[in-house]
Amino acid sequence: MAIRQLSETLINQIAAGEVIERPASAAKELIENALDAGATRIEIATAGGGKALLRVSDNGSGMDAADLELAIRRHCTSKISETLEDIRTLGFRGEALPSIGSVARLSIASRKRDSAGGHEIAVAGGKVLHLRPAGANPGTIVEVRDLFFATPARLKFLKTEKAEAGAITEIVKRMAIAFPAVRFVLSGSDRATLEFPATGDDHLARMAQVLGKDFSDNAIALDAVREEISLTGFAGVPTFNRGNSAHQYAFVNGRPVQDKLILSAIRGAYAETIPSGRYPVAVLSIALDPALVDVNVHPAKSDVRFRDPGLVRGLIVGAIREALARDGSRAATTGASDMLRAFRPGFQPYGQRPQAPWSAETSPSRPYQPAPAFSERPQASFDGLSTPTARAEPQFSPDPVSPGLASPRPVAPETVGRYPLGAARAQIHANYIVAQTEDGLVIVDQHAAHERLVFEAMRKALHSKRLASQVLLIPEIVDIPEEDCDRLMLHAAEFAELGLAIERFGPGAIAVRETPAMLGEVDAHGLIRQLADEIAEWDTASGLSAKLEYVAATMACHGSVRSGRRLRPEEMNALLREMEVTPGSGQCNHGRPTYIELKLSDIERLFGRS
C-alpha cells in the first residue's frame, strides 16, 4: 500500500486519542486555557459525567473572530513561537481545541474585553459548521457536547458517569489548589455545586476549602530554596495520613503533575514516621527556571523531566524533614475528634443503665495513689537512656543523651501552663499517662512515646559517633535458622555501629556479646529474631545511614518501657518533658500517634455544656 497523507480530521482524532482520554482530560485542557487567558473566575458545568455536556466559562482576555478561526486548527497557539526552552504557560502545543472538535460537538463563544461584540464558532466531528457574530460577555465560553460521538469505540473505555464526574472534580480541585487567587465553581445535573471562592495569596485558606479543615489544622508550612529551585507548600504531620497517595499534590511552575520523582521524594521524607501501607498528605509547589525542566515529555503534560533530578529530590526530602523536625512533636488533631465521636454518650436514664459490680480496683471513687515501685528485676527505664543496667559493664563511658529523663523534676499545679503536654495526673491501665494541660488534657501512650525518645537518642548518638555499648557478662545465645544467621552476619558491621555486637556460635546460632548501653536490659532473643526477619526485606540499594536508622528503630522498640508497667509520677512527668523537646515525638517509629489531646471545650461538649 502506498504511503499517503492523512486527512486533517483523522490526524486530529489520532491526537485526541493521546490528549483527550476522557471528559476529565478535556476539562483539564479547557481550564488551563482559561488560566492562561488570565481568568480570575472559572465556572465548569457538566452533565452525564462530562460525556453529554462539558462547559467551561471564564472572564479571561477573550478572542476575536480571527483568533477563533485559528484556535480550532492544530498547532496554532499564542503561547510559544520558536523554542520549548521557555514555557511559562500551562498549554503550549495548540492541540486541545482541534482534538476536542474532531471527536465531539464543540462551540466557542468569545469576546475581547475592549470589543463591542463577540463571535461564536461551531465544530462537529472536525467540520466547521459556522463562524458568526454572537452576544457574549468579555471572556470565553467553551461548550463540548456528545464527547467521542465521532469515535464511538472510545466510549466503551469510559467508566460510569459517577466515576467520570469524580475525575473532573479531582481536576478542578488540583487547579484550585494551584491558583488560590481564582474563583472556581463546578456544577452539574448529577452533582451538588462545588465552589472555591478566591483566597488571594492565602494558600492555607484554599487548602482548607479543597482538602478540608482537618488538613489545614494538621499542616506544617514548607519554604525552602536550593540553588535556583524554590519549594513552598504544606506537609501534613505524620499521624495525619491516608490509605492511598491520592492526597499528595505536586505542582511545577503552577502546573499540576503526578511525577514519580516527586512522589518518591515525599515517601522518602516520611520513611521513618509513617507505617507501611499509609501515605502522607502533602501539597508541594516547585518553582524554577523553565529551562531547567522539560514539560513536553507526556501527552497529558502530567510528567516532567528535571535537568537535575537529584537536586530536586534532595530539596523535597530535606525541606519536609526539616519542617517535621521543627514541628515534630505535634500529633494529628483528628484523633481527638475521632475519640469524641466514639465516646459521645447517647442519653439513657440512669436507672436503665447496666450496673457493673463495684470493685476497689475499678471504682472511680477510689482515691488516686502513687503507683508502686518497680519490680526488682531490671527493666528498660527512662534512666536507661543514659545509664546502663547493673548486669552490664560499659565498654566506654556512656554519653548522657537525655538529662531530662535522668533527672526528673516534679511539676507544681501552678506551672502546668508552662508545658505544652502539661503535668501528669494519673496512669491508667498501666499503659496510658493522663496529663492536665492549661486548656484540657493529654493522653500519652507510654510505650510508643518512650520508643520514639529512645530512637531519637540513638540516632543523635549515632550521628555524633558516641553511641555507647555494654558488654554482657554472659553472652546471650540465640538459636535461629542458618539462612537467618547468614543474613545477620552480613550486616554485623552495621549492627556494631549501633552498639550491638554479634558473632557466630556454631551452626544455627548467634552469640550477642554487646548491646546499646542506653537500652538497659534488652530481650536479645526477640531483637535478633525480629532483625533477621526484617533485614530479609531490606532494599539492597539503601545506604548505610538508612540501614542503621532502620536497625535503631527496631532496637528502640525492644528497649522501650513496656505496656503494663507502672510509673511513678516523677517518671511520667520526665517522659512528658522529654517529648516536648524531642523532634518527631508526636508519633512512634511505626507512625502511630504517641498522644491524643482533648481541649476543655471538647470535654464540655461531651457533657452537653457547650
UniProtKB/Swiss-Prot annotation:
* Keywords assigned: DNA damage, DNA repair
- The superkingdom of the source organism is Bacteria
For this UniProt entry, the molecular function terms from Gene Ontology, in alphabetical order, are:
ATP binding; ATP hydrolysis activity; ATP-dependent DNA damage sensor activity; mismatched DNA binding
GO cellular component terms? Answer: mismatch repair complex
Q: What residue spans carry the region label Disordered?
A: 351-406
Q: Which CDD domains match?
A: HATPase_MutL-MLH-PMS-like, MutL_Trans
- Which SUPFAM superfamilies does this UniProt record tie to the protein? ATPase domain of HSP90 chaperone/DNA topoisomerase II/histidine kinase (SSF55874), DNA mismatch repair protein MutL (SSF118116), Ribosomal protein S5 domain 2-like (SSF54211)
What is the similarity comment for this entry? Belongs to the DNA mismatch repair MutL/HexB family.
> Would you tell me the protein name for this molecule?
DNA mismatch repair protein MutL
What does the organism's lineage look like at the top? Answer: Bacteria, Pseudomonadati, Pseudomonadota, Alphaproteobacteria, Hyphomicrobiales
